Swiss-Prot record:
Basic and acidic residues bias (residue ranges): 158-168
Record bears the keyword DNA-binding: no
Species this protein is from: Chlorobium phaeobacteroides (strain BS1)
GO biological process: DNA-templated transcription termination; transcription antitermination
Keywords for the protein's UniProt record, in alphabetical order: RNA-binding, Transcription, Transcription antitermination, Transcription regulation
Protein name: Transcription antitermination protein NusB
GO cellular component: cytosol
NCBIfam families per record: nusB
Keyword Cell membrane assigned: no
């Protein structure tokens, strides 16, 4: 049975939250969150572990992007849930070439709405990710290939990506 990535992303946020609150290591904090449904789907387990590992391996860099776009905010002032949603989305933007940027951003916004650490979490997450995405795109640091992605040379450019880029 195929596991939806939204559910996996929610588990990733729960693992990151556990790690931040308890100081647990990545393996012990994340293994107990893998449900039988996720465990049966090798692709789901692989995605779950790859995203967590990317965040762990590049946490300083990812946090640097968050800090850059949260003017006058200390990282410790950002709600733990929001901070980890941003980390997950930025890891996807930076290190997962097959995931369209719009998907990573939209998923982060929807998860922020669900976990709702504050009444403005989704707007905060959207603003930070949008600013960071535009920065990364203009500096050439996002490398995405394939249908509906940045470096796709075909005419199948997504209307939502065109709309997103013209709104700025």
């Amino acid at each position: 049975m195929k596991t939806y990535r939204r559910r996996i992303r929610e588990k990733i946020i729960q693992a990151l939250y556990t790690i931040e609150l308890t100081g647990a290591d990545m393996d012990s904090a994340s293994d107990w969150l893998i449900t039988p449904q996720i465990a049966e789907d090798s692709g789901a387990v692989r995605f779950y572990k790859q995203v967590l590992q990317s965040i762990q391996d590049h946490k300083e860099e990812i946090d640097g992007y968050i800090t850059k776009h949260t003017f006058n905010w200390d990282m410790s002032r950002i709600a733990i849930i929001d901070k980890n949603i941003l980390r997950m989305a930025l890891a996807e933007l930076l290190y997962f070439e097959d995931i369209p940027p719009k998907v990573s951003i939209n998923e982060a916004i929807e998860i922020a709405k669900k976990f709702n650490s504050t009444d403005k979490s989704s707007k905060f997450v959207n603003g930070i990710l949008d600013a960071t995405y535009n920065d990364l795109k203009s500096s050439g640091k996002i490398k995405k290939c394939g249908r509906g992605l940045i470096n796709n040379s075909s005419r199948n450019t997504s209307r939502s990506e065109e709309k997103h880029s013209t709104e700025k």
